[in-house]
From Swiss-Prot:
Keywords: Cytoplasm, Protein transport, Transport. This is Nuclear transport factor 2. It comes from the Eukaryota. It comes from Neurospora crassa (strain ATCC 24698 / 74-OR23-1A / CBS 708.71 / DSM 1257 / FGSC 987). The keyword Transport applies. Transmembrane segments: none annotated. The gene is ntf2. GO terms for biological process: protein import into nucleus. GO terms for cellular component: cytoplasm; nuclear pore central transport channel. GO terms for molecular function: nuclear import signal receptor activity. It is found in: Cytoplasm.
Length: 124
């Protein structure tokens, strides 16, 4: 069975940002206890810690705009994904550039989850 990593990455990214933009606390199910987030240099570990970090971000509204993700399979059967785009927070007129990398893994039941997540604003 071959892994259609590009399709999985595209579906994952659409789901992730749709959920993030509508209600960040609902992202908790995409992480596990051994997941790690690095957000602008600050690390959070585990689904609870990551959800706390994401829901504590200092904005009310956010909209992510991004191009097609780049994806590759990993040696361990996972998928690494790179996303670049812009986000608009609250009612700001100027979007902020960002880059985000995900490493997806599968749990024992075969469900995909975010093992690693790195987010960085791209300020020029």
């Amino acid at each position: 069975m071959s892994l259609d990593f590009t399709a999985i990455a595209t579906q994952f990214v659409a789901h992730y940002y749709s959920t993030f933009d509508s209600d960040r606390k609902n992202l908790a199910g995409l992480y596990r206890d051994n997941s790690m987030l690095t957000f602008e240099g600050a690390q959070s570990l585990g689904a609870q810690g990551i959800t706390e970090k994401l829901t504590s971000l200092p904005f009310q509204k956010v909209k992510h705009e991004y191009g097609p993700p780049d994806a590759q399979p990993t040696a361990t059967g996972g998928i690494i994904i790179l996303v670049t785009g812009q986000l608009i927070v609250d009612d700001e007129q100027r979007p902020l550039g960002y880059s985000q990398a995900f490493q997806l893994s599968q749990d024992a039941s075969g469900q995909w989850f975010v093992f690693n997540d790195i987010f960085k604003l791209v300020l020029l």
